[in-house]
Amino acid sequence: MMTAGITGGVGSGKSTVARALEARGFRRLDSDWIVREQVLADPAVMAALRARYGDAVVKTDTAGEPVAVDRPALAERVFSDDAERLWLEDITHPRVFAAWRAAFAAEPGARWAVEVPLLFEKALENWFDFTVCVACAPAKQLARLEQRGLSRALARQRISKQLPLTRKIDLSDFVLWNEGSPAFLEAQVDRLADALVAA
């Protein structure tokens, strides 16, 4: 088994690179998807969120039972308060790690590309054989986040919660620059895939 942790700034193109590696035969894990579709759907997690924030964050059915997390409302709370963000990470991260372990155990011979936004912030390097940083200029990051519907202020707030991109670049085994054409990025992914397969 070989594992590569794909990180970078928010809006840098981690998912694009991970999907490109998937197209080249790697198995892909998207940590944000795991949080969104599995962890936040866990009844125990919804109960903890409801106990802390009430119905402002957890949607309920007509019987008052929790059915879904209002992710924008949750994001507004945790990205504006470091203590709340750390509390949420304490709940979600162990469940994400459990999902990684289960996936790795199910396909122990696979090559894995795992999207991990906070790879270095949370000192998760030891989970992976290699680390890959997908990078672009800050102006490009902001533009991409605004295209997703975030205001410039919220986009800057989310970027500020991560390590500076220069630090992620310094810590990574491989760096891909995602600011040119799709073909430019694909060529870099080709070289990366060859290097990971040969390692």
Language-model features: locations:
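Well-ordered beta-strand positions
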Residues: 27, 33, 130, 173-174
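ATP-dependent NMP and nucleoside kinases share a basic, alpha-helical "lid"
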Residues: 97-106, 111-147
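ATP-dependent small-molecule kinase phosphotransfer cores
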Residues: 36-110
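Glycine-rich phosphate-binding loop of ATP-dependent small-molecule kinases
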Residues: 1-65, 197-199
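Residue-level signal for inorganic ion chemistry
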Residues: 13, 32, 88, 113, ...
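Short, acidic/turn-prone active-site loops that include or flank metal/cofactor-
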Residues: 33-36, 136-139, 160-161, 182
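An amphipathic alpha-helix signature
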Residues: 20, 24, 46-50, 97, ...
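Small-molecule kinase domains that catalyze NTP-dependent phosphoryl transfer to phosphate-bearing small molecules
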Residues: 99, 108, 126-127, 147-199
